[in-house]
């Protein structure tokens, strides 16, 4: 009787372990793609970065507009200093996108002109099993309102 109870438990354990191994591999592979993509942006290779977007994104966007927007953003951010992953997550379904393999990555980044920048990347695996960028977003704190930053003399 004990063997009959242990067998399903063993099956569930092996199945969950297998699933976790694949999730970890998907996250690792997607992270490599995202890191290369971010490096392309930080090195002003915007056209190469744009080509890493999924076909659906490229069909629904204007590459000229995106290239100008990302260039302006990087000028505003200033020179890239450092970046580390703060969270990563695998999902097999996303509302509005359907079933598939998706990885969310969140980075804590530092650029010359901003205190801290959180960068968010969503990647999806296409039908050729290649990871592609689906979305890039960010939030940041500007140095402009830094109380520690000296204000210009206002003639006091």
What feature does the model see in each segment?
Residues 31-32, 47-100:
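Short solvent-exposed beta->alpha transition segments
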Residues 4-15:
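Sec-dependent N-terminal signal peptides
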């Amino acid at each position: 009787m004990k063997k009959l109870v242990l067998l399903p438990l063993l099956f569930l354990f092996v199945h969950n372990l297998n699933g976790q191994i694949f999730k970890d591999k998907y996250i690792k592979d997607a992270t490599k793609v995202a890191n290369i993509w971010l490096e392309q942006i930080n090195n002003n290779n915007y056209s190469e970065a744009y080509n890493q977007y999924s076909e659906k994104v490229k069909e629904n966007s204007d590459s000229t507009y995106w290239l100008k927007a990302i260039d302006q953003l990087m000028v505003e951010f200033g020179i890239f200093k450092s970046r580390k992953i703060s969270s990563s997550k695998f999902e097999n379904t996303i509302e509005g996108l359907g079933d598939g393999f998706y990885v969310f990555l969140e980075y804590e980044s530092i650029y010359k002109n901003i205190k801290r920048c959180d960068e968010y990347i969503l990647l999806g695996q296409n039908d050729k099993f290649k990871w592609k960028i689906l979305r890039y977003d960010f939030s940041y704190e500007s140095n402009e309102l830094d109380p520690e930053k000296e204000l210009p003399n206002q003639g006091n």
